[in-house]
Amino acid sequence: MKFTLFLISALFVSNVSYAAVDPEVAYIFNTFLFIFSGILVMFMALGFAMLEAGFVRKKNTSAILLKNIALYSIAGISFYLVGYSLMYVDVGSYIGSLGGMFYNPTGDELALLDGADNVAAIADTGYSAPSDWFFQMVFCATAVSIVSGACAERIKVWPFLIFAVIMTGFIYPIFGAWTWGGGWLAEIGFSDFAGSTIVHSVGGWAALVGCIILGARKGKYAADGSVTPIAGANMPLATLGTFILWFGWFGFNGGSQLAMGSALDVLAISIVVVNTNLAACGGVVVAVILSQIMFKKIDLTIALNGAIAGLVAITAGPDLQNHFTSIVVGGIGGALTTFAILLLDKLKIDDVVGAIPAHLVAGIWGTLAVGIFGKGDFFVQLTGVLAAAILVVPLSAIFFYILKGTVGLRAVSYTHLTLPTIYSV
C-alpha cells in the first residue's frame, strides 16, 4: 500500500542476513550526522535573521540583526551552563539534575584525547557526547528565535536578551526534559520526532505571550478595528531567509533520526528529507491558492509563511507519514497559518513576521497529525500540546511582566521613529 513504509518493514522482516556494523564505523557516521546536521540547523539562525530583517522596517533592521546574533550566543552559553543538564542529565519525571552543569565530554572521551587506548569504550556509546550537545544546543536557539521575530519593532534589546536567558536556560529545557529527556510525556508515549511542539510550539507560546503583553506597534490597529498594513523593508531578504530555513530544515529533521550507522538509518533519513521537502511544498501551494481566493491576489508574505508552516507541521512526524500524507500535513499547516494570520489581526495581536501562526498553530497541528496519520495516540499527543501551553504561558507571562515592571519591556511610542532608542535598556 505505502511503498516507502514497505521498504522499512522489509528491512525488519527480511530473512536476508546483513553484516554487523562495526561499532567504530557506526560511531563515526552517527557523530558526523550530529555535527553536519547541527551545522545546517545553526545556518537556520541566519535564515531567521534574514527573514526578520526583511519583514521589519528599514530603521529597525540593525536592531533585529543584533537580537539574532545575541540570542544565538546566549542560547549557547545558557545551554552549556544549565540547559543541557536540566534537559538530559538524570531526568526524573519532570526535570533533570544540575549535577551536569558546565557540560563536558565524557571521561572516556577525555582519556582518549589524552592518548588512552580505549576506542572500543568510546565506540560503544554510539556517538560523541560533544556532537550530541552541539546538535541539541542549536535546537534550543531555534525556540527563542521564534520569539524574536514576533515581538520585533517594539521590544527593547536588553529585556529581550534577559528573557532569552530564561527561555534557553530553563523554560525550553524543562519541557524538553518531559519529552526528549525521558520525562513523564515520554513515559506515556508522546511522540515529537524533531520538535513541532518541543521547539516550535514552545517558542510560539512564548511569542504569543510576549506580543500580548507588549501590545501592537503604533499605528497598526485603529480604534474602529481596521488594520493598517506595515510593509517590510526588504522582501527579497525575507524570501532568502525562508529558503535558508527550508535548506536548514533538512538537518533539523534529518539529523533527528539520531543515527546514520546502518542502511536502515540512511533509508529512514532519506524518507525524512523527502517528506520534509514535500510538506513545505504543500504548505506553499495551499497558502498561495488561499491567498488568491481570500485576497484576490497572491501575497508573498502568505507564501513564505506557508512554507515555514509546512516545515513546522511535518517536523513532529516526518518519519511516520508516507510522501503523499506529508503533502497533506504541510498543506493543512499552510491553510491553518493563513487563517491564523487573519485571526490575530481580528484580535489585534501584532505578530510582525507571522511566527505565531507558522510555528505555534502549525506546530500544534503537526503534533496532532502524528495521532491521526502516524502511530501516535491522538489524546496523548493532545496532552503534550496542552502541557506545553500550561508550562510556557504562565512562566513566560511572569518573566515578561517582571521585566516590564523593572527595566521596562517596550520602547516608548516615539522610539518607533528613532533606531538608537530601540537599543536602550
Question: Model-derived features: where do they sit?
Answer:
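Core mid-bundle transmembrane helix pairs that form the ion/substrate translocation pathway
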Residues: 220-283
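Cytoplasmic-side transmembrane-helix entry/capping segments in multi-pass membrane proteins
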Residues: 65-67, 156-164, 298-307, 354-356
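Hydrophobic alpha-helical hairpins/lids featuring a short glycine-rich hinge
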Residues: 122-164
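Structural signature of hydrophobic alpha-helical transmembrane segments
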Residues: 33-40, 129-137, 270-280, 324-331
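Transmembrane alpha-helical segments of multi-pass membrane transport proteins and ion-pumping complexes
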Residues: 42, 46, 50, 72, ...
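Transmembrane alpha-helix boundary signature
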Residues: 80-97, 117-121, 153-154, 175-186
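N-terminal secretory/membrane targeting signals
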Residues: 1-20
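Conserved small/polar residues in nucleotide/adenosyl-binding loops
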Residues: 415-421
